[in-house]
Amino acid sequence: MDLPEDQARFTNSYSLRTTSMETPREVSRSGRLYQSASRSQMAYSRPTMSIISRTSSWRTSPRPLPPPQVPSLMNSILTSRTQQSSPKLTNSASPNLRRKSSLGRLSMDRHGTTLQRTNSGFSTKETEMPRLLDRSESLSRY
């Protein structure tokens, strides 16, 4: 059951501090050192649950730092949907194994050109997560 939107709340706060300082030439050829520190907090709450995500990072560089990517609600939603989607399993041989499995499997076409055949025996398979029962379904039928 979804609650009305006026009972749910989302907050997103972000702060960034960048400083530039003079340093000895042994530390930085440019004579300057750039430091950046950022903090982010996103919170989503409803009467029945609360989710909080906090991140912090810092970087140091002898060159000016590029602007960081600011966390956004859309990035959070996309990350959440990606994690909920069904996993895709891929079984494939590494390039080294493929190369080894194809050695000695050369043949010629009708023009005398060498053909290389590979038959690694590996396949790609996609699976779905088992479907969850909702409350209206009963386990007694199983």
Curated annotation (Swiss-Prot):
> Could you mention a single GO BP entry for this protein?
transport of virus in host, cell to cell
Q: Which InterPro entries match?
A: Luteo_VPG
Chain positions covered by the region annotation Disordered: 1-142
Bias class Polar residues marks the residues at 9-22, 33-43, 74-95, 113-124
Q: Does the keyword Metal-binding apply?
A: no
| Alphabetic keyword roster | Transport, Viral movement protein
Statement: the UniProt record of this protein carries the keyword Lyase: no
Q: Where is the composition biased (Low complexity)?
A: 50-62
Compositional bias ranges of the Basic and acidic residues kind: 125-142
Pfam families named in the record: Luteo_Vpg
* Known function: Transports viral genome to neighboring plant cells directly through plasmosdesmata, without any budding. The movement protein allows efficient cell to cell propagation, by bypassing the host cell wall barrier.
Entry's family note: Belongs to the luteoviruses movement protein family.
Q: Would you tell me the protein name for this molecule? A: Movement protein
